[in-house]
Amino acid sequence: MKKGTQRLSRLFAAMAIAGFASYSMAADTIKIALAGPVTGPVAQYGDMQRAGALMAIEQINKADGVNGAQLEGVIYDDACDPKQAVAVANKVVNDGVKFVVGHVCSSSTQPATDIYEDEGVLMITPSATAPEITSRGYKLIFRTIGLDNMQGPVAGKFIAERYKDKTIAVLHDKQQYGEGIATEVKKTVEDAGIKVAVFEGLNAGDKDFNALISKLKKAGVQFVYFGGYHPEMGLLLRQAKQAGLDARFMGPEGVGNSEITAIAGDASEGMLATLPRAFEQDPKNKALIDAFKAKNQDPSGIFVLPAYSAVTVIAKGIEKAGEADPEKVAAALRANTFETPTGNLGFDEKGDLKNFDFTVYEWHKDATRTEVK
C-alpha cells in the first residue's frame, strides 16, 4: 500500500472507532453512506472504495453540488463481516441516510441489501460481484462492477485456451465470493472438455497451506486457480514457491492488491488475475487521475474508479429524478445512461450493468500489472 493510502487508512480507522466519520461542511446536504471495511484483513479494498467515493463527493460539491445541495460522505466500518454489515445497515437506516456506496465484500453486501431494500435505502456497490446480490427482484440495489458469472468465464476460457495441456487445480476460500467464482471457472474449464484434477476449499484466515500444497504436488498440478482474496493467495504463492511447486497461479479481482506483493514477495511475479479494465490509463480520465496524485492517492486500485462512478451515478440520478427520493432515483438509473470515468453506464432491471469487461493481467513483483494479449 502506498504511503498516502496508509495515512488515509489510519485516519479512517481512528474515526471509525465512533462508528462512522462524516465529510461535509454544508448544512444543506444529501448524505451518502460509505460502507465497507475500515478494519480487518481486506481493509485495503475499503480504502480504495473510500478514496474514489470521497474524491467524487469533493469534485461534485466544488461544482455546486446536486440540485443546490452538497453531498456528505459518512463512513461506516463493516470489516467485511456479514454480522457487522447487518449492524451497519441498521445504523445507516437509523441515521436517516438514504443512499449507500458499498458494501465491498459480497458476503457482507448481500445481508445488508435485505435491510436497505426493506427500508427504502438505495445502495450501489462498486466491488461486490456475487450474482445473488441482484437476483432477488430488489429495486434499490445496484452495482458499478461486473458479476462473477461474467468474470469466471473470462478466466475459465483463458485457462482452457492456454493451459489445456496442464494439470489444473481450482481452489476457493469457502466464502460466497471465492467459492462462487471458482465454481464458474471450474464449469467453464470442464465445459471445454478439460478435466479439473483438484477442486477444494481452504479456510479463509488460515496461515499454513503446506498440507494442501503437498496434495497439489502429489497430483502433479501445474496450474492453480484460486477464488478468494489476497491474504490467502499471497500465502499460497509464497508457500508454494518455498515447497518447490512449479505451477502458475491465477485469481479474480480480489487478489489484485499491492498487499499481495508484500505477502508473497518475488513469488507474486507472474500471477495472473482477471481485473476491471485499467480505467486510470484512459486519456479522458487524466485530469481526475492528476487530482488523485495531487493528494498522494493511488487511482489504480481496482475499486477506486468504480466507487467514484457509483457516487457520480447517484448524483446524476438525483438530478434526473429532481429530488433525493431513492425510489425515484432508482427509476432514473434504469431509464438513463451515465457518463463516468468507467464508461457510459446503463443498468438493467436487476440493477446490474448492461456491459462490463474483465481483462486478464499479469502481476509483477513491483506491484504493477500488464495486460495479457
Each language-model region and where it sits:
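Extracytosolic ligand-binding ectodomains
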Residues: K2-R7, L11-M15, A26-K373
